[in-house]
Amino acid sequence: MPAMNLKYKFGLVNSAGRYLTAEKFGGKVNASGATLKARQVWILEQEESSTISYLKAPSGNFLSADKNGNVYCSVEDRTEDADTGFEIELQPDGKWALKNVSHQRYLACNGEELICSESSTSNPSANWTVQLAIHPQVCMKNVQHQRYAHLKTSEEGEDSVVVDELVPWGADSTLTLVYLGKGKYGLEAFNGKFVQTDGQLAGTANEQTQFTLIFTSGHLVLRDNNGRHLGVDSGTRVLKSSKPGLTKANYFILEDSCPQGAFEFGGKYASLKQGEDVSFKLLVDEDIEDTETFQLEFVETDKYAIRVCDPKKNSRDAKFWKTVAAGIQANGNSKDQTDCQFSVEYNGNDMHVRAPGGKYVSVRDNGHLFLQDSPKDFIFRLLNRPKLVLKCPHGFVGMKEGKAEVACNRSNFDVFTVTYKEGGYTIQDSCGKYWSCDDSSRIVLGEAAGTFFFEFHELSKFAIRAESNGMLIKGEQSGLFTANGSEVSKDTLWEF
């Protein structure tokens, strides 16, 4: 199964605190952005085994510089214009200097105007701070070991991030890249602690948890303040800074973290404890294990393949729900198989699952699944987002400055705690305040906890429906975050 590798999206901030900005028309580019919004987001493209990088604007055009130092963003095909190639030179403080390959000059600023005529990096305006613009919650795979990082507790009770999972399964496999300022990032584990250079976990960020991001041949490298690189200990597989030098053990790939959860119906969870037959056997007051956890892998809008976990976690070969004459079995070999693709529909907090032939998945009295004409009300309980970060085209979701309201145009994200409650979820900020709807349907923070439902529709995007009025939360460019959306659209979908 091909991995869902993430594109590296970022903003570039100059010495005056302004972002590299691509205007919508005329191929114009400048350094006028005060915050990281859509026009300030660039995609990094690199070729395998090449040091040349290309910066792609939201319009799809590429950044370029001519021999006179003029900077444009009008080239549609980078292969037809050598002026689009840049070399990224990492500075001692972690900032980037961007040297145009054709003319050997550095990208800099004169006020808001961009110029590419500097012959050295001594001018502060030729140094750029990098701020990631991808969703920060990811799965992280090591290139050399072809294993995923996850939080693990040793027999002695010590927590560490270990790179030994063939398949990222469970909340412990989701890591968060936290921006710490001045171009530095921290790697936060599921328990809220940060990875240190020595492999131990720290409760708060410090100098030993700061890393500079380096992109090479499409891979990510994290360099610590001592010039060493985060890697995998050959014996313990613990994530820690390695010896000097750079090898494939220091190369990582960031992948999308798909939603994983349990299907609930009639006081029981769907389970694979019976083998390949999917059946509702486990009572809801029992512990949910890997055999009750299923992953929604996006196929197209409102359609998913439902992946199951290999109980032994010793195989990369994916298995999926598959329709058979007797019902549903977990022996599908590919998400591309038509009989492994299920449509999802929503009714309040209930999910209806429609099989490829148009019939709905239902449950017999003995707990086994079969297909029928009418829908059955399931609840999909999301398990691998106990900590939630939300992103939309206008920015990240977080507390509005100076007010007990939630806004959706923040440059930096807030982390919210999600608690499952009777088919819905409560959402709490870092200060212990809960989301709820006020009389104007705005999402506010307070002591009273509102209930919300998640509806999965797109790749790593869901809609959030408020129980209080039955409406979807809608975001606006101004940051307004209100439960007044009546239909699923780009304004009511949230990247999670």
Swiss-Prot record:
> Does Cytoplasm count among this protein's keywords?
yes
- Name the keywords, alphabetized: Actin-binding, Cytoplasm, Cytoskeleton
* MF-aspect GO terms: actin binding; actin filament binding; protein-macromolecule adaptor activity
Q: Which GO terms describe its biological process?
A: actin cytoskeleton organization; actin filament bundle assembly; cell migration; establishment or maintenance of cell polarity
Listed Pfam families: Fascin (PF06268)
Where can this protein be found?
Answer: Cytoplasm, Cytoskeleton
Q: Which domain of life is it from?
A: Eukaryota
Q: Which GO terms describe its cellular component?
A: actin cytoskeleton; cytoplasm
The role this protein plays is:
Acts as an actin bundling protein.
Q: What family is this? A: Belongs to the fascin family.
Protein name as it appears in the record: Fascin
